[in-house]
Amino acid sequence: MNKQFPNYIKYILSNIGFLFVYLFFFRLIFFFFIANFESVSIEEIQTAFSYGIRFDLKLVILSYFPLSLLILSTNYLFFKKKVFRKIAITYHILLYLLLTIVYLIDIGYYNYLFSRLDASSLRFLSNLKISSQLVVETYPVYKGLFALIFLFVFIRFISIKLFDKIARKDVIFLSKKMKAVYFICTFLLLSFGVYGSITHYPLRWSEAFFSKNNSVNQFALNPVLNFFDTYNFRKDGVNNELTKAYFPIIADYLGLSKDSISFKREVTFDSIHKQKPNLVIVMLESLGTVALGHEGNVANATKNIDQIIKESTYFENFYVHKPGTAASVFSSITGLPDIDTKETASRNLRVIDQKIIFDQFDGYEKLYLLGGSANWANIRGVFKSNIKNLKIYEEGSYEVENRADVWGIDDYDLFNESDKIFKNLHSSKKPFVAYVQTATNHRPFSVPQNKESYKPLVEGDIDKTTLKESGFISLAQLNALRYLDFNVKTFLNKAKESGYYDNTIFAFFGDHNTSMNETESFKKEFDLGFQLHHVPFFIHAPKYLKPKKISTIAKLADLFPTLATVAKSDYTNFTLGSNALDTLKTNSFGFLYLKIKGEPGIGLIQNNFYFTKTIQNNFKSLYKISDKDNIDVSNMYPDIVSSMDSLITSYYHSTKYLYYNNKK
């Protein structure tokens, strides 16, 4: 029977088999070296493998379908003409190289964000120079290029050998009827592989999200298919009808008139400070609440920040809207969540023009300071287009510059240079509002071997059990946070020496949590998927605020309304943020922009409940945060589901409305 099997069919199936084995090899690499399955059952792993293999087979067949159709159409002629031989060899080389590159990018992407490659990754192409440099400084790119050259030679050799071997075999002459049978059967077999299911419904990406453990779900996905499956979720637009319908909900929360859609609230103060206080907002790169020793982390990486928190007003339930530095910078400045599906809102030229509170500090010098270039993610546009007379200090602006990595000068030098600028302004009796963006607590974790009293830990300084319990993925990650902690303390000490400390309101917040493993203290947040959003926010201003802990929920959009209130600086609020120090507001909430089973979604944290729903399919879930089990309790609390659904929908559509209707 095998001898009667057409050579061109053998050629198709052989190549599909080889490519499948090749992709399965990558899946094994991901399983053994990338994924974290310490607390996962064998059954879940088996199920993930089952889905993963089916996704891989689907990709293999789809990848090979164009050449398969050509072979089936030409059958024996395919091995007789040299042009087809060149097409086959070139096709295989390009296919293997392209898939290899994508899979390698996927591994790096997962290490960075704990997520498989998807369409949102296209945002990194908007600043290809920085993204490329980060990759080069973090991964062995040049060694990889040599490996790709070797792969090119190897695939070319194998492709030639296989083609020539099949071509030399005796030709079995078939009738037109049998050729048609083989064509149809092969086509149906390949189609079934793409369909991937014996049920009425084809294999879909959502099936990979079968587990409550996100690591398992991510492992089941195929990066190439996942990229294209998420591509359609990049659409944007305003639904004026829904905005109008749900406006009364957000109007009640913000204290607005319901007569017309307007978010304008004028805030004035009966008394003002004798001397205008300075404001310094420090964005703490990749710092989540879970990493704080103050919150029980056993690594003791933030002993300086922990002490500062005790001397500050600390918001223990503070949430950023969307994980990502660009998203948090945009939200903190504009007072609007970043709900852009494709990239980040900062990159959307149609939405960066906003009426913001930062611009309303009359009589203040306004500054934005960072170690690298302000061109990344169009952040320069967000600041420059909205803040009059803003001065940007970036790489190339400072007196002393020792470039550390792709992010420019490190945090130590950034704080040193910032202190010089603030000291000069203080000496000139010019009040200032400054936004300082740190970066060293970010890959590639370029911490120095010695900086004053700081020294990185080495193997043996911390036992593996403690490192594991702390949730840190690596010693390098831990050292980067310790360096940030050291620099924050050093900066405040310099502020005292320079004379502007007493009259300055310092606000520190994390832009998002970094990728960390599960910890005992924050297991619930890890399981429900909002640990990345929970970050510290504390206002250090001993002259203006007494130290205290605030347990009510606050969100990133509240940053500037809160700070303007502490400074007693009159402002007009056009944003969705509120004063987080308002003790009368007991129904506060956190608004999160999420991915739910691969689909864009939104989440709301309020009164011990966590409500989520997908944007397109409107799939809803409700969880009680204090419960031990992660069980959807929607059926038990229908009134709460209805209330939270209305609030989150109103907030979401109000955000989109303000994107395009809050221009100066």
Located regions from the model:
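Residues that form generic nucleotide/phosphate-binding pockets
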Residues: 52, 56, 134, 157, ...
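Short alpha-helical "patches" and their helix-cap loops
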Residues: 82-86, 238-248, 345-349, 577-578
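Solvent-exposed soluble domains appended to multi-pass membrane proteins
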Residues: 256-664
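Transmembrane and membrane-interface helices of multi-pass
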Residues: 2-237
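Generic detection of long, well-ordered alpha-helical segments
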Residues: 15, 43, 84-94, 121, ...
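The feature marks either
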Residues: 127, 213, 220-225, 229-268, ...
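Generic alpha-helical secondary structure signal
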Residues: 7, 43-44, 82, 122, ...
